[in-house]
C-alpha cells in the first residue's frame, strides 16, 4: 500500500481486507494467550523463525500485528514491535544495543525518564552514556568512544522542543559505523519521518500522540532496515549466532528486520513487557485520526505561542517556531507543516508564580502525560524532572519558573481564556 497517502495508510495498513474469520471491518481484539499449530513440523518452523506467524501471546498477537504494520508503514520502516509502554520500548532499544559494556552519546535535553534510565539505571548493568549539547557536532563527535553503540536523540526535545539536526547526526553516526536512534514521540510520523533523514531506529511512546486520548499505555520500536548490523562486529547478539535462540543469527533469519526481531525473540521473550490486545486496539483507534488531530494541535499551538509571546507576565517562550529560537532554521527544515505542541514558557517570577498560574487553570489538566486531545500543564522542576539536580535542570534548560504546556484540540478561544485566568491569579499576588 506504499503508493497511498498518509491519511489513507493510517486507516488501512495491516488490515487491507476485512477480518478473514468474521468479515469484520474493524480490527478485532484477539484476546488469546496462544495459537494452535497445524502439526509438529509447523510448530518447529514457527519457533525456528522460518515460518512467520504467531507463537505465543507474550511475543505476538494479531491485533498487535496490525498496529505494528501500520506504524512501520507510517514511519517508512520495514518492521515494528509494539510493547507495553514507551519506557519499555526505549529500554529494549538501549539494552539491545548497549549490552556487554556499551556506551551511548545522548542528547542532554531529553525526556526525564530517558535521562534517568541512561544516567542512573543502565550503569548498574554496565551500560554508560555521555550527555552532550546535541547542537554542537564537534562535542558530539568528541564524545564517541570505541565502545559507543549509538547516538540517541529526540526529534523535539522534552520539555523545551529543541530540534537536533537529524541529517548531520545521521551522517556522523554512520561515519563511525553507529546507528542513529530517534525518539519521534513528539514529532509523529505525520509531521516528520526520521528514517528519511538517516535515522536507523525510531522509537515512540504510543501513549502520547499515536494514541492521543490519554487512555492507553504503549510503545513502538520501528526498524528502518537500513543498518548493517554485521559490519562493525559491535552487535553480536543481532548478527552472530545467538546461543539463547539455538544459534540463530537474526541478520540471517530476519534480514532487514533483524533488530526488532531480536528484541521480540529474546528481550521481550525473557522480560515480557507485552502490549495487551486491548491496548493495541485502543492505540489503533488513535492512529486512525492522527493526521486530523495533529492539524488541530498545530493550529492551536501557533495561536498560543503568539499569545504568550506578547503577554507582559511571560519572560520567555521556548518554541522553535519563533524567529529568535536557536533552532528556528531547523524547525523550518524539518517541520514545514508546523509542530511542537508540547513546549515551555518562563513566567515572570519563580516557583510561587508558576504554581499559582497552574493551580488556577480549569481547562488545562495538571498531570504528567502530554500529547492528549485535552490541554495539559505541569511544572517540570518539581515533578517530571524533579529527580535531576539543580545543575542538571539548568543544563537542560529547566528553571524554577518554567511551565510546560501540552496544547490540546479544544476551541482556541477557550484555551486562551483559561490561560488568562492563570495570569490573572499571578497578577493578584
Model-derived segments and spans:
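Conserved PLP-enzyme active-site core in the AAT-like
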Residues: 2, 18, 80-311
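Active-site beta-loop-alpha junctions enriched in small/polar residues
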Residues: 156, 185-187, 322, 348, ...
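Short, acidic Gly/Pro/Ser/Thr-rich loop/turn segments
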Residues: 18, 36-40, 228-229, 290, ...
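Short amphipathic alpha-helical segments
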Residues: 52, 78, 279, 283, ...
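Conserved N-terminal alpha-helix of the aminotransferase class I/II PLP-enzyme fold
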Residues: 39-91, 113-120
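Conserved C-terminal alpha-helix-loop-beta "cap" of PLP-dependent enzymes
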Residues: 294, 302, 306-309, 313-403, ...
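PLP-dependent enzyme catalytic core of the Aspartate aminotransferase-like
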Residues: 78, 101, 119, 128, ...
Amino acid at each position: 500500500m506504499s503508493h497511498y497517502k498518509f491519511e489513507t495508510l493510517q486507516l488501512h495498513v495491516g488490515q487491507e481486507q476485512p477480518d478473514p474469520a468474521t468479515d469484520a471491518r474493524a480490527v478485532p481484539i484477539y484476546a488469546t494467550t496462544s495459537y494452535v499449530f497445524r502439526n509438529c513440523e509447523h510448530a518447529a518452523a514457527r519457533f525456528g523463525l522460518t515460518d512467520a506467524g504467531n507463537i505465543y501471546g507474550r511475543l505476538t498477537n494479531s491485533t498487535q500485528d496490525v498496529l505494528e504494520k501500520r506504524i512501520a508503514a507510517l514511519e517508512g520502516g520495514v518492521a515494528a514491535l509494539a510493547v507495553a509502554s514507551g519506557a519499555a520500548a526505549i529500554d529494549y532499544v538501549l539494552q539491545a544495543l548497549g549490552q556487554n559494556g556499551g556506551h551511548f552519546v545522548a542528547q542532554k535535553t531529553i525526556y526525564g525518564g530517558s535521562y534517568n534510565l541512561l544516567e542512573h539505571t543502565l550503569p548498574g548493568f554496565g551500560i554508560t552514556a555521555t550527555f552532550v549539547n546535541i547542537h554542537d557536532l564537534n562535542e558530539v563527535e568528541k564524545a564517541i568512544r570505541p565502545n559507543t553503540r549509538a547516538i540517541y536523540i529526540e526529534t523535539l526535545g522534552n520539555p523545551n522542543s529543541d530540534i537536533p539536526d537529524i541529517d548531520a547526526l545521521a551522517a556522523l553516526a554512520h561515519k563511525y559505523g553507529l546507528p542513529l536512534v530517534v525518539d519521534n514521540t513528539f514529532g509523529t510520523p505525520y509531521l516528520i519521518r526520521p528514517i528519511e533523514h538517516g535515522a536507523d531506529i525510531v522509537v515512540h511512546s504510543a501513549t502520547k500522540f499515536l494514541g492521543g486520548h490519554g487512555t492507553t499505555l504503549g510503545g513502538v520500536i520501528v526498524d528502518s532496515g537500513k543498518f548493517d548490523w554485521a559490519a562493525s562486529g559491535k552487535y553480536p547478539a543481532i548478527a552472530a549466532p545467538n546461543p539463547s535462540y539455538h544459534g540463530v543469527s537474526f541478520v540471517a533469519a530476519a534480514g532487514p528486520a533483524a533488530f526488532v526481531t531480536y528484541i521480540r525473540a529474546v528481550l521481550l521473550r525473557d522480560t515480557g513487557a507485552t502490549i495487551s490486545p486491548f491496548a493495541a486496539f485502543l492505540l489503533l483507534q488513535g492512529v486512525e485520526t492522527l493526521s486530523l488531530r495533529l492539524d488541530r494541535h498545530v493550529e492551536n499551538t501557533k495561536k498560543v505561542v503568539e499569545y504568550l509571546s506578547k503577554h507582559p507576565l511571560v519572560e520567555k517562550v521556548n518554541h522553535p517556531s519563533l524567529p529568535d529560537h536557536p533552532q528556528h532554521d531547523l524547525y523550518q527544515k524539518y517541520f514545514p507543516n508546523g509542530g511542537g505542541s508540547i513546549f515551555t514558557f518562563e513566567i515572570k517570577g519563580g516557583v510561587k508564580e508558576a504554581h499559582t498560574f497552574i493551580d488556577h487553570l480549569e481547562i488545562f489538566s495538571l498531570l504528567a502525560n502530554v500529547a492528549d486531545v485535552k490541554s495539559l500543564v505541569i511544572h517540570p522542576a518539581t515533578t517530571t524532572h524533579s529527580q535531576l539536580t539543580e545543575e542538571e535542570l539548568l543544563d537542560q534548560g529547566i528553571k524554577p519558573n518554567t511551565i510546560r504546556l501540552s496544547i490540546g484540540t479544544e476551541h482556541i478561544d477557550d484555551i486562551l481564556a483559561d490561560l488568562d485566568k492563570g495570569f490573572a491569579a499571578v497578577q493578584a499576588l
